[in-house]
Amino acid sequence: MPPKTSEAQEAYFKKLEAEFLHCREIATAARRKGYDPSLEVEIPSATDLADRVEVIMGVPGLAAHIRKCEEKMSREEASLQVAADIAEGLVGKFKDEEEAVQCAVRTAVAVLTEGVVAAPLEGISAVKLAKNDDGTEYIKVYFAGPIRSAGGTAEALAVLAADYVRRKTGRAPYKIRDVEVERFVEEIMLYKSIAHLQYTPTDEEIRLIVRNCPVCIDGEPTEQEEVQGYRNLERVETNRVRGGIALVIAEGIILKAPKVKKHVDKLKFDGWEWLDKIIAGSKPAGGENKEEEKKIKPKDKFLADLIAGRPVFGHPSRAGGFRLRYGRSRNTGFATAGIHPASMTIMDDFIATGTQLKVERPGKAAAMVPVDSLEGPTVRLFNGDVVRISDEKTALKVRPDVSQILDNGEIIINYGDFLENNHTFVPSPYVEEWWIQDLEEKTKDKVEVNSPEEAFAVSEKYGVPLHPKYTYMWMDLTTDDVVYLARYISASGMVENGELRLPVEQRSKSLLEILLIPQKVRDNTVILSAEDTYILCRCLGLNPDLSMKNPDAYAGLDSHAWKAVSALCGVTVMDRAPARIGARMGRPEKSKLREMKPPVHVLFPVGEAGGMRRSLQDASAYSKSMTDRIGEIEVEVGRRKCPDCGKMTYMVACECGGHTIPVYGCPDCGISGIEGDCPKCHKPTTPNVKQKIDVKGLYAAALKRVGERDNFEVLKGVQGLISKEKTPEPLEKGILRAKHEVFVFKDGTIRYDMSDVPLTHFIPREIGLSVEKARELGYEKDTYGAPLESPEQVCELRVQDIILSHDASNYLLKVCAFLDDELEKYYGLPRYYNVHEEQDLIGHLVIGLAPHTSAGVLGRIIGFVSSSAGYAHPFFHAAKRRNCDGDEDCVMMLMDGLLNFSLSYLPDRRGGKMDAPLVLSMRIDPKEIDKESHNIDVMARYPKEFYLATREFKAPKDVEKIMDLVSKRLGTPEQYEGFKFTHGTSDIAAGPANSAYKTLGSMEDKLKAQLELGRRLRAVDEKDVAERVINSHFLPDLIGNLRAFSTQQMRCVKCGERYRRPPLTGTCPRCGGGRVILTVHEGAVTKYMDVSLAIAKEYGVPSYTIQRLELLSLSIKSLFENDKSKQTGLADFM
């Protein structure tokens, strides 16, 4: 059943689908010419989750069965029921029970992951039936590394699904042996030492799970390391580490135990009672207990693994750091936070749109975007002036003169992110949107506050707290500080023309800076504006002539400074910054073309003949010996046969015009024509054999066919093919890619990567979209229902429309030119795109695809911005199973995917089907996408009850009923539209276009900038930053490189062959004369040594760290310095 939509939304979907069908028609016509591995387009379209699962699993009739189950039960329950039905033979046909059980478990995982990720195929390598010691049959599930892409819940429920299938098919529980238990313990701890786990289980937790789990959690080897203790076990097939079992047990069953328990209880399963012990032994998701929360305990986890060149912007909860503000702008939410663009600029451009910050709370990380309706930073200049910055221009102007950044400004985080992370609220500051609701409770009159006098008058008249705009950071002072400041001003200050003038005195100056009061310093005198003078005197209980109104009032004041100020000024003064958010830089934003390593134009093998560059031109001129034919090379490719003329070849298209088919055979027995296992030796058959290819002739013919000359620098192929049938791509495609300077990916497509940023509303002006073009795209009205007439109106973004970077447009223009040439010159069809400038790309369709997934999402380009990021609706990102905490995805032109993608090019190895568009989602159904998007709040303002709840440290779920969330709109037309936001922003691409981390040159430059910024930030301890950089980045690097140098291989510069030790001849025996060189050089080992010692001494890191560096320096010197021959000069003997 299609999702409910309004007429306008339905018209939008139909418009996208009509254009898709037009594209597919053209691609199908091209494919039918027989020049590609398949005569059909190889990306099937899917309308819903059920369709996607059926395509991925390849079981006819599965989609209808899934839809039937989902009508009656939840997603999780439906996944289990479908699995049971497959295992019992109600859906699909299989050769034996084992295959049916395997399909059942994989299908359950596919349903749980919305049919988007590759985990069902790649993460579950096999499901087998095996025997217990008592002869009963149990189920064994083999997990592989890609199961991680399914997420913890799906990992855990895959085990539950296998148990459900076991029960339905009458099989016994797994009965583990004691040695196997201890093997699990050793193996998971070994995996933790070589790879990352979100949670490290205790030995007892591991033993509890594996002793009681009713199915066997097994896996294929994923690491080279082997266990040392429990080796060569009868029922364990490998001694190598199996990463899949560690992921499923640690990140799946243990971390998601409460969710698994909920389903176990609902299904009334016995044998899972041990989950209660796991739940009791694990920490609650929120992290802190109530007493700790009420103190807002700082969390320093985000500072772990600090990297050189990526600054810390605030230590945990430290004054001067980012001030939390609750709300959602049109470009925040879904794990994205916003700060003022002036904050980005004043921090030396290290933060740009899309830059990832590791944050203290509520989650682990967030992408950053500009929101100029927030408060900007406050800085102190070298001349002592304090400036509150509210725009980028001012930030750029004063940046060279800043001596300290006193306050980073505000950071906006939405309610939905706290709900998603189940993080207990931290207190909200008293903000304007709260003050307005306080005032509305007192009067229905329209009240304007344009001066401090009016602000105090309104507070006195209506009994509301002082307006936040006129409230200083009193909570950062002690009551003693307040009393001292009042007495100092009364005794030493004077007022001229309404401006307070104070002699510069260290403590009072420092207190005024902590309060973030703008000030000037002239002739050793601090000068405050008339407005700030009025506010400060009122708050300190001083008369206009600076005399104390009531000298006795300063005795017995409340210990909280802001409460003490309330008592002195006679109106309630609220806390402006009860919570600060610590942060450091994570990944820089990304907007870059996707390349294989090394970059490739065509998936055509050139072997050693192509040299280090894999050049087709070099291969065309290659001759192994004087007697060999020039341009003839020997490479491994698949044998194919033309059904029309019977000719054997390696190409997809036969010279006679026929479309060839692969011919499988046994390499040992010589039997051919049988796919599967050889009937004689029982080894797998393969079409792949070494064959001689006339590259020179092929290349010349391909150039002639597409009407091009060999005038490009290099046409790059691959050294060898790694697909199952080793099918080469037509050279003509590579020639046209080289002409247009675009590069192919492993599946035949051309991609462009960008950081994910959410957007629910846009202004046509900011994305370069004219009003006429916007209307043409279907944007007839703005978000408030008014006809669209101005490029400054705010429009609500359709769920499958995307906005790309200008850099992306430059590359996609080249891609479109390549595709038009391909259609015209290779397929003999009319050009399709005919684009010449950026604006021509608007309205064209793309495929969005995330790494580790196998389902693309249909999208439409509607504009471009200067930021290095890709903007799309949160639903678009969620449909790819991504959020926006710094993730990056790719786009490809739709025609490119339909024309050039082929399963025949995908690597034949674990993970080969990941990051490939095996299916295309045509229409986003909010009910079928990642549930994190359901927690996005879509209201114009948060109610007062929300702010009060934050002050009481309540859980986000306690206020869910009063918040307007996407989850409450599911199943209605409002699930797509009518979204609102609490805070506006004038330009989604404001601030720096790129992070300074990307624009600075060497690592030394980046490190210097990082530490210099740390010196200026009030919220940062630069000594701690220096120590963390040395301990978490430089020391491990130095030690690792030193180890790598001593165990390195040698490499031939000519053919690339590697050797464990240098050949005695000094040249490469394989290619006969290539120079053999080191793969790890002295410079790689010593590159961080000097800079580490320099910053260790400059920043006064602990002596233990300095001693570690000095010992390492001695080790490096002993390795590289020659003690026997030392250059001496005359001065050495004087």
Curated annotation (Swiss-Prot):
Family: Belongs to the archaeal DNA polymerase II family.
HAMAP family in the cross-refs: DNApol_II_L_arch (MF_00324)
GO biological process: DNA catabolic process; DNA-templated DNA replication
An example Gene Ontology molecular-function term: single-stranded DNA 3'-5' DNA exonuclease activity
Pfam families: PolC_DP2_cat, PolC_DP2_central, PolC_DP2_N
Protein keywords: DNA replication, DNA-binding, DNA-directed DNA polymerase, Exonuclease, Hydrolase, Multifunctional enzyme, Nuclease, Nucleotidyltransferase, Transferase
EC code: 2.7.7.7, 3.1.11.1
Source organism (scientific name): Methanocella arvoryzae (strain DSM 22066 / NBRC 105507 / MRE50)
Assembly and binders: Heterodimer of a large subunit and a small subunit.
Gene from which the chain derives: polC
Protein name, entry field: DNA polymerase II large subunit
Reactions it catalyzes: DNA(n) + a 2'-deoxyribonucleoside 5'-triphosphate = DNA(n+1) + diphosphate; Exonucleolytic cleavage in the 3'- to 5'-direction to yield nucleoside 5'-phosphates
Role description: Possesses two activities: a DNA synthesis (polymerase) and an exonucleolytic activity that degrades single-stranded DNA in the 3'- to 5'-direction. Has a template-primer preference which is characteristic of a replicative DNA polymerase.
Superkingdom of the organism of origin: Archaea
